[in-house]
Amino acid sequence: MTYSFFVDMTCGGCSKAVNAILSKIDGVSNIQIDLENKKVSCESSKMGADELLKNIQKTGKKCSIIA
């Protein structure tokens, strides 16, 4: 399943932090980060949107589920 999130990223460091968190989760793949539009998309075979959102929130950035 593919999920999209709004993440209030302001720099490359923010996007790297989000990528690092998602990359460590088993079953997450195809991570795409659009820094300009503050959008993060990924595929997950084991985790739902709410669980992914909780992990992204560990970066300290405001975020919400888009789809």
Swiss-Prot record:
One of its GO terms (biological process) is copper ion transport. Residues 1-64 form the HMA domain. One of its GO terms (molecular function) is copper-dependent protein binding. Pfam families: HMA. The keyword Transport applies. Transmembrane segments: none annotated. Keywords: Chaperone, Copper, Copper transport, Ion transport, Metal-binding, Transport. InterPro entries: Copper_transport_ATOX1-like (IPR051881), HMA_dom (IPR006121), HMA_dom_sf (IPR036163). Cu cation binds at residues 11, 14. The keyword Ion transport applies. Coiled coil: none annotated. GO terms for cellular component: cytosol. Could bind and deliver cytosolic copper to the copper ATPase proteins. May be important in cellular antioxidant defense. PANTHER family: COPPER TRANSPORT PROTEIN ATOX1. Belongs to the ATX1 family. This is Copper transport protein ATOX1 homolog.
